[in-house]
Amino acid sequence: MAGLSSSQIPDGEFTAVVYRLIRDSRYSEAVQLLSAELQRSSRSRAGLSLLAYCYYRLQEFELAAECYEQLSQMHPELEQYRLYQAQALYKACLYPEATRVAFLLDNPAYQTRVLRLQAAIKYSEGDLPGARSLVEQLLSGEGVEDSGGESDYDGQINLGCLLYKEGHYEAACSKFLAALQASGYQPDLSYNLALAYYSSRQYAPALKHIADIIERGIRQHPELGVGMTTEGIDVRSVGNTIVLHQTALVEAFNLKAAIEYQLRNYEAAQEALTDMPPRAEEELDPVTLHNQALMNMDAKPTEGFEKLQFLLQQNPFPPETFGNLLLLYCKYEYFDLAADVLAENAHLTYKFLTPYLYDFLDAMITCQTAPEEAFIKLDGLAGMLTEQLRKLTIQVQDSRHSRDDESAKKAVNEYDETLEKYIPVLMAQAKIYWNFENYPMVEKIFRKSVEFCNDHDVWKLNVAHVLFMQENKYKEAIGFYEPIVKKNYDNILSVSAIVLANLCVSYIMTSQNEEAEELMRKIEKEEEQLSYGDPDKKIYHLCIVNLVIGTLYCAKGNYDFGISRVIKSLEPYHKKLGTDTWYYAKRCFLSLLENMSKHTIMLRDSVIQECVQFLEHCELYGRNIPAVIEQPLEEERMHTGKNTVTYESRKLRALIYEIIGWNV
């Protein structure tokens, strides 16, 4: 019946056809027929009413509201149309308009429904005291004349939502749990409970309820294609249907992704997003779009920025969007863009940024032009946070001493949250001196924070890096790198390649060659096992370790051994040559060429021949490999022909020929 027009429908069958389409949830086709019919008879009450219903089911709430507005003007005596108009406006997030229409309703028969709607509007607008007042009025039955008073079940849910918004997550859990036990399984209620558990950092019970939602959704609605995209199966969009909304699958997968992201299981987080029922990009809800942008930022930063910028223009958008966009601008050092967004959206600053986040962003933006001033701002922020950490430490100790487990748990959670705020401030301070290569000062900043951060992995990793960079503290660097590596020894490829490389170099520089060799054998073994399952997968860990070791020997002037190590590390080229590995290799070659041009070193002909052959291989295998990864928002893009390993390897080969006087 796709594309059916009014003229094709036999006389007297139009209404039956429309109702059949609605029965089969083919609302778009029903809209086409009804719209065409209303062009001929624009004041048809039945036609407008059905059209409004179809728009509502298609989640085209503004269009539904327009239809209901026409109906209420045509039939002012039928107040249900005004109520439906207010509900559609609320669903379209047009809260002032919905409030205005709701206030026009004075029929006692609709009083409870109007109060519920007004409470929902105030809740969505962030007016929690106003929402609570209306919810309590409904629960008490005060001033409610119609018979449809608020049930205890609805009341528990509404109070749970208010408690959640007020930050009382455990109390919200109790309300949702009571409602769930009273009603039996409800997908949206299970999601509310999972969200409250997540916000109180109780990830295990949150994941349990999420798994329940997903399992039931798959069993009851196999047509929604859960997991198909992850498995690489090409499937068509399931659309934003009412059935999809009722299953709460989209919400559950987004929450699962958020939990995995918090637990730093980034692959699992991305998989949660691809597991959700397939939809076209234009059909995605704001939360999914936001999470996709965030979790694919490393691989697709340009797309990520575009999605976040797009969301910022929508009403509403996820409240985290504004802060995350600004933080990512700072991460990629687009400080001017961050400053512009802050200046252009002052009204959002007070609504979506906490004082801490605003002060942090202000300091980060200041770093670009006035690093000394930025350091002072960050120092003030750090001082405030360390004071909070000390107070919370005392609270934890006092609670444990008095055996008040609940207070101790609350204080520990607050301590962890405050520490997560302190670490970025500390790292931003350290980066100011790192950029000036003042490594002793960076070390001093880290040592001042040892009281709070000595168990934090990010802190330990950065302490290791700054000790390593000072070149006379390799032994101390080992003390920080080793625990990180040993913690993940059974899954060593999950450790950053540069951490493994720096640890190997530190072993070599402290004459612990056996430890370095053992670590490299372990990496090689894991890479071999991984390549059995996926022979074409590029794995760079051992390659980067060898490149860094080769770089070390080149830096010490032993180019014969260093360059040979670099060359061997990139074999086989089809698996080892990449943007990152080329970066390390070309640095060594540029250093070699500089010293050759100054006549400070002499290389054997066999080594020069080896270099030329290496660059020829890089030219052959590097045609489709970018020489550098461009910044995502760069206005002037590099010439595509020049931004390849092939182009740069030719340039290096030409320089070799020029320096040694070979004719080509």
From Swiss-Prot:
Please provide, in alphabetical order, the Gene Ontology terms of the cellular component aspect for this entry.
ciliary basal body; cilium; intraciliary transport particle B
Question: What InterPro entries is this protein classified in?
Answer: TPR-like_helical_dom_sf (IPR011990), TPR_rpt (IPR019734), TT30 (IPR039941)
The answer, when asked if Kinase is one of the entry's keywords, is no
Q: Which UniProt keywords apply?
A: Cell projection, Cilium, Cilium biogenesis/degradation, Coiled coil, Repeat, TPR repeat
Chief subcellular location equals other
Where is the protein found, in the record's own terms? Cell projection, Cilium
Question: Which residues are in coiled coils?
Answer: 507-534
Q: Organism's domain of life? A: Eukaryota
A GO BP entry is: cilium assembly
TPR repeats span which residues? 11-44, 45-78, 153-186, 188-220, 385-418, 423-456, 458-491, 543-576
- Entry's family note: Belongs to the TTC30/dfy-1/fleer family.
Quaternary structure and partners: Interacts with the IFT B complex components IFT27, IFT46, IFT74, IFT52, IFT57, IFT80, IFT81 and IFT88. Interacts with KIF17.
Write out the function statement from the record.
Answer: Required for polyglutamylation of axonemal tubulin. Plays a role in anterograde intraflagellar transport (IFT), the process by which cilia precursors are transported from the base of the cilium to the site of their incorporation at the tip.
Recorded protein name is Intraflagellar transport protein 70B
From the broadest rank down, the organism's phylogenetic lineage runs: Eukaryota, Metazoa, Chordata, Craniata, Vertebrata
